[in-house]
UniProtKB/Swiss-Prot annotation:
Gene3D superfamilies: von Willebrand factor, type A domain. One of its GO terms (biological process) is hyaluronan metabolic process. Residues 297-457 form the VWFA domain. InterPro entries: ITI_HC_C, ITIH, VIT, VWF_A, vWFA_dom_sf. Residues 19-53, 692-935 form a propeptide. Belongs to the ITIH family. GO terms for cellular component: extracellular region. This is Inter-alpha-trypsin inhibitor heavy chain H2. Keywords: Gamma-carboxyglutamic acid, Glycoprotein, Phosphoprotein, Protease inhibitor, Proteoglycan, Secreted, Serine protease inhibitor, Signal. Residues 45-174 form the VIT domain. GO terms for molecular function: serine-type endopeptidase inhibitor activity. The modification 4-carboxyglutamate is found at E271. PROSITE patterns: VIT, VWFA.
């Protein structure tokens, strides 16, 4: 399936782009454009039920308080705000807070003009059911939802009456991980306006003792002298309480200068090489971070994506970073480079010592790389694994060394093996047990969940790198984290009769500047002390490290400090356990194992009252008749994908010949039986929601390009017209029930497929699905799952969800059903269509989608700030024209039909003018099965 374009087409509800439902009869969701205008992490006031800023001073931010307490790396943070409406008009107030990615929300409450809303944790489906029950009665006060980017957002909007007060309070918890020799505690401070009382208090309690502590200046010196730091031997207090005058950007300014982060960095004392073992309230925590050891030699393979999408700043920054990284290699290290696009190249076919001459030659090689072509991740990784395996088999590796592979890529595979689960399996089968794979995903076009599973499966970790001017420093920072292996094969051992439910206690490597944390349970009635024994291999010797902790060692210390959290060991154990279970769930080998793990995660989430990917927080008033819902960000994709290859043929042999000399026979497609076919959707396709929003994925450029078509209800748009193959796909528009904001939204209400050579017509509406073969007609309903088999055309209906139309068991088209509640005042049911890559279309294929079966050359350059700071602009050369495009987000509803998944794309204005051939009206056809007549 090389060189093919992958398409996704769907209508994006403008209402579905927000994450809140305002109160008191306001619109169900915020407008997409409006949402983009709301900077993350700020307080917003929306006067007069509009996004105007007139009269915002009539709403006062009375207080903005943040309290953080860190007890032995376990951080609990509370954010509390109070707002008063002095306006004679009702005002909409948005509570919009950023919290660290990976933190668990544990509580949320708010009081609106005397009415208190409190939270409870429910299993996600139960929580959503409660919310929808209230919504059906018109009793939903709002939708609150956290979402994941580099941070996670927690947001809700309320409407407050004149003279009313509203108070918000959010609790979350996280573990502080040691990185490059210190712990960082970051608090995002973006109140959005002057606050009468702005207070930040950070209390740090570390029984090991504080080695150092300082507060970083992230406000360009504006608040010099304002943070007050009091540091003791084992405790510290950081206070940040600027007055209203100090908050002002300038003495006469009404804008606040508080817009950034308060960052506290610290480290603790370490007297024992065996680490610090702490026991309290039936739980133990073992911290291990030895220093002053000789580094272990590394065998390191850098696998670098040099496909066309890396062109420009990404490649420039990667080269800059790699030159510095190569200079940092030690003389005892061995290394090589694998760079790949659709082809695989190696700087050296084997590992070489990191001498000055070899490093200089490698830097010259890196500097000459010119990005182009596709992305063959599968073969690139297998080549790197092969080099390491050969060196090991030939006895060329120091038996006491550490072997690492570092993958740097910015996109999904487009050449060779495309099925992510197959790549994951190939790597797992070929990599040796002593090799760790680290994956760095540049930008947002890469499937980060895949990289995470790939690395977690092979003793490594993944990290997202943001593709900007800072890429080089991010890459270097990551390398620094793994550049100094001090120990390998680290094992934590405790008496089995004394402890239970121990978290991960075996680690392939320990890197200098980091910390390993192990936790578990014990019975305090049967245990007075706990022994921990660590075995590991250093650069020079096999180590056996022993430590002993007393039961009452912490009790007296914690009792003296009212800020200390007596449940820190319990929370830390739960945090580690749940995250490790989530990782195991994403890599579960079978549905049965996944189900068992899911049950454990769910029970722990409910027991510890935290929002995880399997739970939701229901927020309701005392009467229980007004509700909000807070979900965790979408979880990683898991195991057990379907067996049907979605829209592409099975590759006969995904392993290169130099790895597996015996070619794998072609895997047959599954036989179509009586059950409904389900499959994992391909990573790149298209979607449509309203006015139709088209998204075109260009694999060579590895870019998503999107555009809107504004047409009239009843009109029929041609999506694909291929007279040579005899295939037509058209969509008929329907409209919303009434205007909204002066505009009548349109959607696809019918999708028509015509397979001329088979004399088969398929009509899919929001009510029925019909298959016509000559004079014979089969009609199906969305209310039941079903399967209709024709000689060459199969139709699979998944109840109230999707219709899959499969031709010759080779290519599948998916149509998604989007239902709205029956009495919705504006919206109607509609359809979205997804068209995958296929060789079924001839070179004569055209249409709004069909024309991109043959990918046009594009070049995106001169990226710059746009009118909206959240939406940068760029120039795009395509088809002999230079267009101005805008960066934005669209929704993919295939895996999450309710909230969708954000997909970044470059937006072409004026109904795709310049990107599509001609004008969009050229693609109107008279009938649902009409071929497009090209001028």
């Amino acid at each position: 399936m090389k060189g093919l374009t992958c398409f996704l087409l769907c209508f994006l509800l403008s209402e579905a782009q927000g994450f809140e439902i305002p109160t008191n009869g306001l619109s169900e969701f915020a407008e997409y454009g409006d949402l983009a205008e709301l900077a993350l992490g700020k307080f917003h006031v929306v006067p007069g039920n509009r996004r105007s800023q007139e009269g915002v001073d009539q709403v006062t931010l009375y207080s903005y308080k943040v309290q953080s307490t860190i007890t032995s790396r376990m951080a609990n943070t509370v954010i509390q705000t109070k707002v008063v409406n002095h306006s004679p008009e009702p005002q909409d107030v948005v509570f919009d807070i950023q919290i660290p990615k990976g933190a668990f929300i544990s509580n949320f409450s708010m009081t609106v003009d005397g009415t208190k809303f409190t939270s409870s944790i429910k299993e996600k489906t139960v929580g959503r059911a409660l919310y929808w029950q209230a919504r059906a009665k018109g009793k939903t006060a709002g939708l609150v939802r956290s979402r994941a980017l580099d941070m996670e957002n927690f947001k809700t909007e309320v409407n407050i009456a004149p003279g009313a007060k509203v108070q918000f309070e959010l609790h979350y918890q996280e573990v502080k991980w040691r990185n490059l020799g210190s712990y960082e505690h970051r608090i995002h401070l973006q109140p959005g306006r002057l606050a009468k009382h702005l207070e930040v208090d950070v209390q740090i309690i570390e029984p090991q003792g504080l080695r150092f502590l300082h507060v970083l200046d992230t406000f360009d010196g504006h608040f010099d002298g304002v943070p007050v730091v009091v540091k003791g031997q084992q405790k510290a207090h950081v206070a940040f309480k600027p007055t209203v005058a100090q908050q002002r950007k300038c003495p006469s300014c009404s804008e606040t200068a508080v817009d950034g982060e308060l960052v506290v960095m610290y480290d603790v004392n370490r007297e024992q090489k065996a680490g610090e073992l702490q026991l309290f309230n039936g739980y133990f925590v073992h911290f291990f971070a030895p220093e002053s050891m000789d580094p272990i030699p590394k065998n390191i393979l850098f696998v670098i994506d040099v496909s066309g999408s890396m062109w420009g700043i990404k490649m420039k920054q990667t080269v800059e970073a790699m030159k510095t990284i190569l200079d940092d290699l030690r003389a005892e290290d061995q290394f090589s480079l694998v760079d790949f696009n659709h082809n695989i190249r190696t700087w050296r076919n084997d590992l070489v010592s990191a001498t000055k001459t070899q490093v200089a030659d490698a830097k010259t090689y890196i500097e000459k790389i010119q990005p182009s072509g596709g992305t063959n991740i599968n073969e690139a990784l297998l080549r790197a694994i092969f080099i390491l395996n050969e060196a090991n088999n030939l006895g060329l590796l120091d038996p006491n060394s550490v072997s690492l592979i570092i993958l740097v890529s910015d996109g999904d595979p487009t050449v060779g093996e495309l099925q992510l689960s197959k790549i994951q399996k190939n790597v797992k089968q070929n990599i040796q047990d002593n090799v760790s794979l680290f994956s760095l995903g540049i930008g947002f076009d890469v499937d980060y969940d895949f990289l995470k599973r790939l690395s977690n499966d092979n003793r490594g970790m993944a990290q997202r790198i943001y593709g900007n001017q800072d890429t080089a420093s991010q890459l270097k920072k990551f390398y620094n984290q793994v550049s100094t292996p001090l120990l390998r094969n680290v094992q934590f051992n405790y008496p089995q009769a004394s402890v239970t439910d121990v978290t991960q206690n075996s680690f392939p490597n320990y890197f200098g500047g980091s910390e390993i944390v192990v936790a578990g349970k014990f019975n305090p009635e049967k245990l007075e002390q706990l022994q921990g024994i660590i075995t590991a291999t250093s650069a020079n010797v096999e180590l056996v490290l022993e430590t002993l902790a007393e039961m009452d060692g912490l009790e007296a210390f914690l009792a003296k400090d009212r800020h200390a959290d007596p449940d820190f060991t319990k929370k830390l154990w739960a945090y580690l356990t749940i995250n490790q279970l989530l990782d195991e769930r994403s890599r579960a080998p079978s549905a049965a194992v996944k189900k068992k793990i899911t049950k454990s995660i769910l029970q722990m989430s409910l027991d510890h009252h935290i929002v995880t990917p399997l739970t939701a927080m229901v927020v309701e008033n005392e009467a229980g008749d007004e509700r909000m819902l807070a979900d965790a960000p979408p979880q990683d994709q898991s195991c057990c994908s379907g067996t049907l290859n979605y829209g592409r043929k099975v590759t006969p042999n995904s392993l290169p010949s130099w790895v597996n000399p015996l070619p794998t026979p072609r895997v047959p497609l599954p036989a179509v039986g009586p059950s409904v076919i389900e499959a994992t959707p391909p990573p790149h396709v298209m979607r449509v929601e309203n006015d139709p929003h088209f998204i075109i994925y260009l694999p060579r450029s590895q870019q998503n390009i999107c555009f809107n078509i504004d047409s009239e209800p009843g009109k029929i748009l041609n999506l694909v017209s291929d007279p040579e193959s005899g295939i037509v796909i058209n969509g008929q528009l329907i409209s919303a029930k009434k205007l909204k904001d002066g505009k009548l939204s349109t959607y696809f209400g019918k999708i028509g497929f015509y397979f001329q050579h088979e004399d088969v017509k398929v009509e899919i509406s929001t009510e029925t699905i019909s298959l016509s073969r000559g004079s014979r007609v089969s009609v199906l309903s969305w209310s039941d799952s079903a399967l209709v088999l024709n000689q060459r055309v199969h139709i699979s209906v998944k109840k109230e969800k999707t219709v899959t139309v499969t031709l010759d068991q080779e290519v599948s088209f998916s149509v998604l059903l989007h239902r709205v509640w029956k009495k919705h005042p504006i919206n109607v049911d509609f359809l979205g269509i997804y068209i995958p890559p296929t060789t079924k279309f001839s070179p004569k294929a055209h249409g709004l989608i069909g024309q991109f079966m043959h990918e046009p050359e594009i070049r995106i350059f001169n990226e710059r700030p746009g009118k909206d700071p959240e939406k940068p602009e760029a120039s795009m050369e395509v088809k002999g024209q230079t267009l101005v495009v805008t960066r934005g987000l669209q929704k993919d509803y295939r895996t999450d039909r309710v909230f969708g998944t954000d997909v970044p794309c470059w937006f072409v204005h004026n109904s795709g003018k310049g990107f599509i051939d001609g004008h969009y009206k050229d693609y109107l056809v008279p009938l649902l099965y009409s071929f497009l007549k090209r001028p």
